[in-house]
A protein has these predicted regions:
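A shared catalytic/ligand-binding motif for oxyanion handling
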Residues: 1-163
Length: 163
């Protein structure tokens, strides 16, 4: 990551478990993670360069989302809260989960896999969570930035995401 000048990386669906606390550590980076303990898969992680003025934050209890976060202090700017979020696809997007995360600070950025599909963001179709997130964008006063290309590459696919 340092070769590509990455300061912060956010990961969802880590599949990491508490019995391997040093799994996936990266030299020169602090690893924060929230492992799913009640079943397989899931989990979130956040890596930040050791030289940054970052620190872990406590995530409030969430009903359907999984999250890991930090506070980033920057000279001349207010503190920024950065959160890696995973919403498993069978779970519903809940307003209370989003509100709890946005309440972590004055400037909060949520990155992650929300499993929300909406044609407004370039998806071929909508799903329940995509419609709900689109509605909540106005009600809770936040913005959505979605990638311009697909981020899902099924295992059976012959697409190489590195190209």
């Amino acid at each position: 990551m340092s070769e590509n000048s990455i300061d912060i990386a956010l990961v969802q669906e880590t599949y990491l478990k508490p019995n391997r606390p040093k799994a996936c550590s990266i030299a020169g980076y602090v690893q924060l993670r929230t492992d799913r303990t009640y079943s397989s898969k899931g989990g979130t992680a956040l890596y930040y360069r050791r030289s940054l003025h970052c620190g872990p934050i406590n995530i409030p209890p969430l009903t359907n989302m999984e999250a890991t976060g930090c506070r980033l202090a920057m000279t001349g700017h207010s503190t920024l809260v950065i959160v890696s979020v995973y919403l498993p696809s069978p779970k519903r997007l809940l307003r209370r989960d989003l509100r709890a995360l946005f309440a972590l600070g004055d400037a909060v950025i949520l990155f992650g896999d929300f499993n929300c599909k909406n044609i407004r963001w370039g998806c071929p179709s909508n799903n329940y969570n995509g419609i709900k997130l689109d509605e909540l964008e106005d009600r809770l006063d936040f913005g959505i930035i979605a990638p311009s290309t697909s981020t899902c590459f099924p295992m059976s696919s012959h697409i190489d995401p590195r190209r």
